[in-house]
Regions:
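Conserved catalytic SET/PR domain of SAM-dependent protein methyltransferases, capturing the structural core
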Residues: 1-124
Length: 124
């Protein structure tokens, strides 16, 4: 694909198989809400218990160098003792996504957090 070309339907399908999704656009995963945070502004909070290893979804996408942030990526706050980790996945050349995974059990009402610097892959 040339840099100035638009993505076609096949590129989109290959990037993220929309046919497998019941609802292709879900702003936040089930069990998460945006609420006022004591850390900074607003943050992501649980409405139910979530266990270590739960994959929450994509926080960011990069298409041909342009970064797109999802609500999941836009509202998760920083902590030096995070309960989530973000991982980069190369989907295909020029297309990356970042996913968020829980690294410790989180009780209902707790805020989700990431460490905005480098992550330790051993904690996943």
């Amino acid at each position: 694909m040339e840099k100035n070309d638009m993505m076609n339907d096949e590129d989109i399908k290959e990037f993220h198989d929309l046919d497998k999704l019941k609802d292709p656009y879900k702003p936040l995963p089930h069990g998460l809400v945006i609420a006022d945070s004591q850390i900074n502004g607003q943050g992501l909070f649980t409405t139910r218990r979530l266990v270590r290893g739960t994959h929450l979804g994509e926080s960011h996408y990069r298409f041909d160098g342009k970064l797109v942030r999802t609500p999941l990526g836009g509202f998760i706050n920083h902590s030096n003792e995070p309960n989530c980790v973000r991982s980069q996945v190369r989907v295909k050349p020029h297309y990356d996504k970042w996913t968020i995974t829980i690294i410790e059990d989180i009780e209902e009402g707790e805020e989700l957090t990431l460490k905005y610097t480098m992550y330790d892959p051993e904690k996943i």
